[in-house]
Regions:
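Acidic (Asp/Glu-rich) sequence patches and key acidic residues
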Residues: 1-204
C-alpha cells in the first residue's frame, strides 16, 4: 500500500517518457530514457518501447510507502499552533474521536483532515456515464507555507526522524525528505497568479 500524491492541472501538461515504471526504494517512477530501461531490464525485448511526448493533467507525482506514516506523524507543521485535525469520513460518527495537532501526515496523506487548507469536490464522469466525486485540495499561500515548514523540519531533524525508519527497510527518511523537497520545488515553480489552475490530489 502506498500514497500517490499529485499536483493536478486544469490545463494539459506536456511530458516525455517511456511509459515504463519501476519501484525504487519504495517509490514508483517512470523511466525517462531507453538507457534507463535497458539498465533495469537488460534482457528484455525493447522493440516496442519508445520515448514519446504525451499530455495529461499531472504536473507532479510522488509515491510514498505507507510505512512512512509513522515518521510523518512526528513532523509538526510550524505556524499551526492550536489547529487540530478534522475527522476522516469513517471517524465522523465515532464518539471517541480525538483531534490531534497537525503533522506532515495531515498535509501529505490526508489533507482533508487539515482545517487550515481549502478543499474542493470535483464531479467526474467516465465514457460509460459512471459518475464519482474526487476530493482535492486547492493550492494557496497557506498550503505552500505548510509544505515549506514540513520540508524545513524534515531537513533539520534527520537523527530524530531516522528512528522511525521502517524495520523492513521499505521506505526511508531520505525518501520522505526527497519527496518534500520535490513537492516544494514544484509548488514554488507555480506563479501565484496561476494557483487556481492547480490542485493537490491524494490517493491512498
Amino acid at each position: 500500500m502506498s500514497l500517490d500524491l499529485y499536483i493536478k492541472s486544469r490545463r494539459p501538461v506536456r511530458h516525455r517518457g517511456t511509459g515504463v515504471f519501476v519501484r525504487d526504494n519504495g517509490q514508483t517512477r517512470e523511466l525517462k530514457t531507453l538507457a534507463e530501461v535497458r539498465e533495469h531490464f537488460p534482457d528484455a525485448d525493447l522493440t516496442d518501447v519508445h520515448v514519446t511526448d504525451y499530455e495529461d493533467d499531472e504536473l507532479f507525482h510522488a509515491n510514498l510507502t505507507h510505512n512512512l506514516t509513522e515518521m510523518a506523524s512526528h513532523i509538526p507543521i510550524a505556524g499551526t499552533d492550536g489547529a487540530v485535525t478534522l475527522p476522516r469520513d469513517f471517524e465522523r460518527d465515532k464518539p471517541d474521536f480525538q483531534p490531534k495537532p497537525l503533522s506532515a501526515y495531515n498535509l501529505l496523506w490526508h489533507p482533508e483532515t487539515n482545517p487550515l487548507l481549502k478543499h474542493e469536490t470535483l464531479h467526474r464522469k467516465d465514457e460509460d456515464g459512471e459518475e464519482w466525486d474526487v476530493e482535492v485540495t486547492r493550492i494557496d499561500a497557506e498550503l505552500v507555507r505548510q509544505v515549506m515548514a514540513v520540508q524545513h523540519y524534515t531537513a533539520h531533524h534527520r537523527e530524530e526522524l531516522e528512528r522511525y525508519n521502517p524495520d523492513n527497510g521499505w521506505g526511508t527518511y531520505d525518501q520522505l525528505l526527497r519527496a518534500t523537497q520535490d513537492l516544494l520545488i514544484a509548488l514554488l515553480d507555480i506563479p501565484v497568479s496561476d494557483y487556481g489552475d492547480y490542485l493537490i490530489y491524494c490517493s491512498t
